[in-house]
Structures are given as C-alpha cells and as structure tokens.
Amino acid sequence: MTTDDDLAARTGQALTRRGWRLISAESCTGGLLAATLTEIPGASDWFEGAFVTYRLSAKTAMVGVSPALLDRHGAVSEPIARAMAEGALANSDADIAVSITGIAGPDGGDVLSPVGTIWFGWAIREDTGIQCVQTAEHHLSG
C-alpha cells in the first residue's frame, strides 16, 4: 500500500527532475497537503508554499477568486478549483499549482455536492503564461 509519505516523496522527485516548484491552494484540507509535502527532506527545493483558503473571503483575498464566480457556482465546483489553481500560480513564482476544494463533512453537503465531494485543479506555468489547466471531481466516503 502506498502511504502519503511515499506519494509526497515521489511528487518531490518528479518535480525535482523537471526543475519545477509547486504551490498549493487548499480549502477543505486546511493545509494538510502542504504539511504532508513539507515533511519530506529537501522539500524546500521544490515546494514553494501554500494558500490555505478555507473561507470564501480567503479564496478572494489570497488567490483572486471572483466573488461573482463563487456566488454563481459555489465554493465546491469545477470553476472554483480552476480559479484557485490559476490564482495560486499567478500569485507565486511556482511552476505548477494544485488546488483542492471540497465538502469534508459531516454537514454542508447537498444533492448536487454531497459530503465527500472534492474538486482538484492543476495549472502549469509555461513561457506563454498559465497553460494546461485541468480539473477533476472525486467523491470520497467515510
């Protein structure tokens, strides 16, 4: 079984091979991704930092998510995961960003986004600007 530390170390190795630095924008995880990554020796070579944007106002203030976008789609949605990743990259010197927004529970879910709904976003900086933005939705249980 792969542990969080194994995944974090492999992430660091892949980033090091490419000469990239990672930034995260986290909501429901409250900085857990950043904490896990920084436990790896040498993480300062490839980990830029983290924006912990638990509240809606933090998403706006820290990574520039539009209040109108939040009103239109809600905090747990594909457009917000995308905007968080793009905003983290735009507000840092990192090469790649990952965002996480979701409903950890035990309350707060609804029919469209039940507890356990998580959206991830990734954005990569290229010579022409922020490119290659991708998102993925997952539903976790327990």
Where are these regions (language model features)?
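Short alpha-helical segments enriched in small residues
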Residues: M1-G142
